C-alpha cells in the first residue's frame, strides 16, 4: 500500500484550492435551489474551512448559482401558472393570491432566500404572480448574499479554532461524528423529498 497517497481530508483540501471546484459548486447550488433538497451549507462550510482564503469566491459562486436557479424557477412560475390555474379551474384563488403577494411579496422573497428552508415555492410564486423580475432577482440575490456572507464571516472568524479542536479529537470520535453527520444529512434529504 502506498503511504504517500493523501487521505480524504487532504484530497478535499486540494480540491477546495482547485478552480475545478467552482463550476461543481455552481451546479450543486443550482440543483439545491431548484430540485434537489440537500444541505448545501455543509459543502460550503467544508470548502471554506479547507480553503479559507477562497471563502468570498465561494460566496460569489453560491450567490450566482442561487440567482440562476431562482431565475429558472421564476420563469417556470411565469410560464406555467396561468395554464395550470385554467386547467384546475382555480383562477379566482390565483387572482386573490396575486394581490396578497403583490403587497407582501418582497418580504417573502427576501425571507425565502435568507432562511435555510427551501425557497423554490417562493420563487415559483413570484413568477406566477407577475412580481417584477428585476426586483425579485435583486431581493433574492441580496438575501442569499447576506446568508452566505454571514456564514463565510463566521467561518473566517472561528474556523481555525474549530479545526484545531477537531484535530485534537481521537480518530474514533472524529469518525463517529462524521458517520452521525452523514446519517443526519441522509435523513434530512429523504425527509425533504
Language-model-detected regions and their locations in the chain:
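Selective transmembrane alpha-helices of multi-pass membrane proteins
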Residues: 85-109, 167-193
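Membrane helix-loop-helix hairpins that form the core translocation module of multi-pass transporters
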Residues: 56-94, 103, 154
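Short, Lys/Arg-rich, polar N-terminal cytosolic tail immediately upstream
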Residues: 1-15
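Hydrophobic membrane-targeting alpha-helices
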Residues: 75, 79, 157-161, 185-192
